């Protein structure tokens, strides 16, 4: 197992990467994914980390970095290897290697349990959208 900084733009814009990352986007098409990833790649404060096991990429985490703080823009694990601690290991490994003091994320009811298991504290908020409101959670992990 290894966690690596991925700078392979071709792979990050591939259908293989999309197949992993799509689960943390709201009903994306491949074109939606590529647009978002290109936006991430154009921002020098954003880095993409990959979880790789025996040469197979099974996890991705997109972080926006600011000094010793980071915001998780998205984290996703291949469906066939979920619930094995890969997401938690991805966060832990990157936080340790970058010596992060604080990691933040915003999530929904579907994923709040994951962040709780990783040790994040949470603040429940209601976000208004044109088609209604939804519950979200601001999650924070301090070292």
PLM regions with names:
Residues 77, 83-96:
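Conserved acetyl-CoA-binding loop-helix of GNAT-fold acetyltransferases
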Residues 87-91, 111, 127-135:
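Short glycine/proline-centered loop/turn elements that form peptide/ligand docking sites
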Residues 96-110:
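Conserved GNAT acetyl-CoA-binding A-motif
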Residues 1-35:
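Short amphipathic alpha-helix that is part of the acyltransferase structural core
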Residues 24-53, 57:
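Active-site rim helix/loop that mediates acceptor-substrate recognition in acyltransferases
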Residues 102-106, 121-139:
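Conserved catalytic-core motifs of GNAT/GCN5-like acyltransferases
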Residues 50, 56-64, 69-76:
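Conserved beta-strand in the GNAT
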Residues 115, 120:
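Conserved active-site tyrosine of GNAT-family acetyltransferases
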């Amino acid at each position: 197992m290894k966690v690596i900084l991925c700078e392979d733009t071709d792979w990050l814009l591939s259908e293989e990467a999309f197949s992993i990352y799509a689960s943390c986007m709201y009903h994306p098409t491949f074109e939606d994914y590529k647009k978002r990833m290109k936006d991430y790649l154009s921002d020098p404060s954003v880095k993409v980390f990959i979880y790789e096991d025996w040469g197979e990429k099974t996890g991705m985490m997109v972080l926006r970095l600011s000094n010793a703080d980071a915001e998780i823009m998205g984290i996703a694990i291949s469906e066939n290897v979920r619930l094995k601690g890969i997401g938690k290991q991805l966060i832990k490994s990157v936080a340790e290697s970058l010596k992060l003091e604080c990691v933040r994320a915003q999530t929904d009811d579907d994923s709040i349990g994951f962040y709780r298991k990783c040790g994040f504290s949470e603040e429940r908020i209601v976000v208004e959208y044109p088609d209604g409101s939804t519950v979200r959670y601001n999650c924070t992990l301090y070292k």
